[in-house]
Amino acid sequence: MGMTLAEKIIARAAGRDSVRPGEIVTCKVDLAMMHDSGGPRRVKPILERLGAGVWDPQKVVVVSDHFVPAVDAESAAILDLTRKWTAAHGIGNFYDMQGICHVVLPERGHLKPGMFVVGGDSHSPTGGAFGCFMFGVGATDMAGVLVTGETWIRVPETIRLDWRGRLGRGVSAKDMMLATCARLGMDGGDYQAVQYTGEAIATLAMSERMTLCNMAAELGAQTGIIAPDRVTADFIAAAGGEAGDIDRWQGDADAACRSVHEFDADTLDPQVAAPHSPANAAPVAAYGNVAFDQAYIGACTGAKLDDLHMAAAVLKGRQVAKGVRLLVAPASTRITAEAAADGTLATLTAAGALMLPSGCGACAGLGAGVLAEGERCISSTARNFKGRMGAQSAEVYLASPYTVAAAAVAGRIADPREFLDGGG
Amino acid sequence: MGGQGGRAWVFGDDIDTDTLAPGLYLKRPIDELARHCLEAVDPGFAAGVQPGDVVVAGRNFGMGSSREQAVEALRHLGVDAVVAESFAGIFYRNAFNLGLLALICPGVGRIGGGDRVAVDGEAGVVRNLSTGETWACEPVPAHLMDMVRDGGLVPHLEKRLAARR
């Protein structure tokens, strides 16, 4: 019997001809990525205690994105430590305040199909969009990787999410994932590998594929993964990387999966997830008059260039409703520059958006845009757990950038298709 | 985790890492962060939990972020063991890395808050001393039990590195 893509990557990293689900194997790590929150400030004391250095500084990428820019003495100290530690350990791949790690990593050409990658953040499955096996670990696990260059893994089964058809106008990868969370639940991924397949996936741009793999975390999967194709190779080449042999990193036709779930992209409507779980998703039409204090477009999940384009398509020539504040935090400084060059930023700011720094920001309750008690926000981020974006009694609804922008204009939940050219 | 057992603190399904280690306090020292551990679902937990007490939970305990302060806060408060119907994968790894025993134990949700519970990690058995019920847990992979015996990944690596020298 053949192997899935995930199994092939793990077998290669474990130095084996083949692996089977359930086996526990030790893998050599091709790349380790960490950020300012779970990275240097947490691994430094561990490495010092062990009297050990970094196994291969070339294989480490550090991105400051959680506490950027510094807003108080504590965040300034964390960033200072991050800079000093990366310099002391010769980490050349340090991206300081240039965007969110999951977006910066592929943007700078670090990912290549077939790689076995660990990231010190739960949304690390994002890298699976590039045909990598990439998963999130905590800081002590990361310290172990930094010292030994290896980590253990229980070979996951593969769960296939097969998407037929094509997404309609005003519907995006975010809607696909909210609908998936609603159907499978927050532990439907059961720490296995979720692989996205089907015509709808093949037609998606890389940024949308990143959103799918990113939110595999919300299914409780160990990772999300998409087999590389020409779209993948073109993105990597444009980012200055090398895609390598994409034909090698495909699953075998006779590989066994735990299960296959079928979805229909043609009939998918824009989705909104009510507080306090991404799995509380329902089509936008299921909601009545839900009004908002804040609309937030940000994070690795919802503020890539395509996400900003979605918001701009709705906001063009319109104004944010009175009483609503629209905050936009582009996922990287490169995206900000591209959005400035193509006129997207002008569209957003003309509509009344306030631009925020590129970083994790309010998504993780850390940066600008956190909520007061009793406030309600609609957000393009990935999680709406109670208290995550600020006060315990605040409510966060999750939606696509299209739908967040539509809510900003309407002041309440609205179907974004009514705001797009030719709509209404 | 001896014969006297500890008090059971019982939680439901899908307890997330923002609840265990709220983002608002992530940049604060662990003693301050730990005071807010689980406060969104049980405001009395951090002040009331005693060393040796046991956290009992439903499905998908520790879902969400990879922040290991979610485990560290429990350890800081003296919790040595969490028994749950199931765990989120990253939390499960983090638990053993920091020497916290995480036992998957179907049916354990029947334990009542305040019951006396004894956990035997080596045997993989959870006993409700208040009711006499016992549960067999899913076996823990041998390399993770080794790690817990050593007190976590760092002391475990210390041993490995010392052996190499």
Q: Which residues fall in each region the model found?
A:
Chain A
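Fe-S-dependent hydro-lyases/dehydratases of central metabolism
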Residues: 1-424
